[in-house]
Amino acid sequence: TDMLGKKITVDTKTGGNNNIIVGTKASLNSEIQKAVSSDLDQINEEGYIIKSININNKKHIIISGKKEIGVLYGVYSFIRLIQTNKSIEKLNITDSPKTNIRILNHWDNLDGTVERGYAGSSLWNWQKLPDFIDQRYIDYARANASIGINGTVLTNVNANALILTPQYLEKVEALANVFRPYGIKVYLTARFSAPIEIGGLKTADPKDADVANWWKSKAKEIYARIPDFGGFLVKANSEGQPGPQNYGRDHVDGANMLADAVAPFGGVIMWRAFVYSEHDANDRAKQAYAEFQPYDGKFRENVIVQVKNGAIDFQPREPFHPLFGAMPKTPLMMEFQITQEYLGFSTHLVFLPKLYQEVLESDTYQKGKGATVAKVIDGSLHKNKITGIAGVANIGSDLNWTGHPFAQANWYGFGRLAWNPYS
């Protein structure tokens, strides 16, 4: 009503002319199903169609998908057409996301502070959860769904094990319940030393049977509360964070142990490749390559290695990370930074999607010319089952969400490129 200046009539029955008919494939009547069947065959489980049809001399616009989430994405796409003054005559749109995991990484701490955050404090008011559900949680979910984001990591990669305790999992469950209708899965960061800090064990060695069993038990506990829990994001053996190397193990040992814990429930481990130490003799730019490339193909099927766009640390003009052209047997996901750590915080006006686009269009030459970074992360180059793209969020408690009002465009642009890295 606000957008068009007139009230729209909503009905559960199809009749009359010039209808917008919205629903899953299964909910459409047989006549309409037949008219859009070939279009629906072209989309995946999250995809949608927007199609103008004429049945019995009556015009309709059909917005449909195989699943409810696809229908929701289709509705947002249709609204975007209207908002941008595009024609809605003779529509014939079929669209599906190119990546499986399109996710925001919140570097939010449990005390309400946000590492590299320039838009106020954390959105998550842990003190009031699970009983008080802030309207902003719902608005956050709607905004993300409108640009195709389907996952959120609630906590900082410099992790706090307390998030895995029952007291906090109850709060996480409340957020998951809010986000679920909008197709957004909740993920958490896993502190590698959690078995010691909250589990009473004397070690966090990934080869220790008690440690592996502790993580399996913890995963079972989480999935009992949140059946669609996405999995864990892990920062290990970097900038002082604990990890498998503390016990003479490697990244594969750590990632695979956690992967085995969440695998029975369909969970994913996103293991970060951002590793460096001031005590390591290696050139920092080479360290991730040195620690990960030799293990190409050794990770479990439900592990995806999350690689920053550059080898140093989100530097404004650094080349794309060499790992994108060096691990053909391992799913890799992109990690972009939406928050402006190196680009003026929330003081400067910067449009980041052009930077993202440049990285995605860069050629790895992994299989000859045209083997772009986008083709690596969307799985089309190496036929990966798990694909993804992450963005370190620039969102906080500020009334305009992002501190600088223009920074909303970076959140928006990330979501659109996560859906389609070629757009």
Question: What residue ranges belong to the model's regions?
Answer:
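Active-site-proximal beta-alpha loop/turn segments in soluble metabolic enzymes
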Residues: 196-205, 235-246, 274-284
